[in-house]
Amino acid sequence: MRLTQGAFSYLPDLTDAQII
């Protein structure tokens, strides 16, 4: 899930996965 992709688009995919 990339619900945070919009707000965390500046972060790496690894961080995006951790935010989930």
Swiss-Prot record:
Coiled-coil features, chain-numbered ranges: none
Keywords assigned by UniProt, alphabetized: Calvin cycle, Carbon dioxide fixation, Chloroplast, Photorespiration, Photosynthesis, Plastid
Family in the record: Belongs to the RuBisCO small chain family.
Compartments (UniProt record): Plastid, Chloroplast
Subunit structure: Heterohexadecamer of 8 large and 8 small subunits.
Induction summary: Expressed at a constant level during a 12 hours light:12 hours dark diurnal cycle (at protein level).
Protein name according to UniProt: Ribulose bisphosphate carboxylase small subunit
Functional description taken from the UniProt entry: RuBisCO catalyzes two reactions: the carboxylation of D-ribulose 1,5-bisphosphate, the primary event in carbon dioxide fixation, as well as the oxidative fragmentation of the pentose substrate in the photorespiration process. Both reactions occur simultaneously and in competition at the same active site. Although the small subunit is not catalytic it is essential for maximal activity.
Gene Ontology biological process terms, A to Z: reductive pentose-phosphate cycle
GO CC terms: chloroplast
InterPro entries: RuBisCO_ssu_sf
Name of the gene this protein is made from: rbcS
Entry superkingdom: Eukaryota
Additional observations: The basic functional RuBisCO is composed of a large chain homodimer in a 'head-to-tail' conformation. In form I RuBisCO this homodimer is arranged in a barrel-like tetramer with the small subunits forming a tetrameric 'cap' on each end of the 'barrel'. In this alga, in contrast to plants, the small subunit is encoded in the chloroplast.
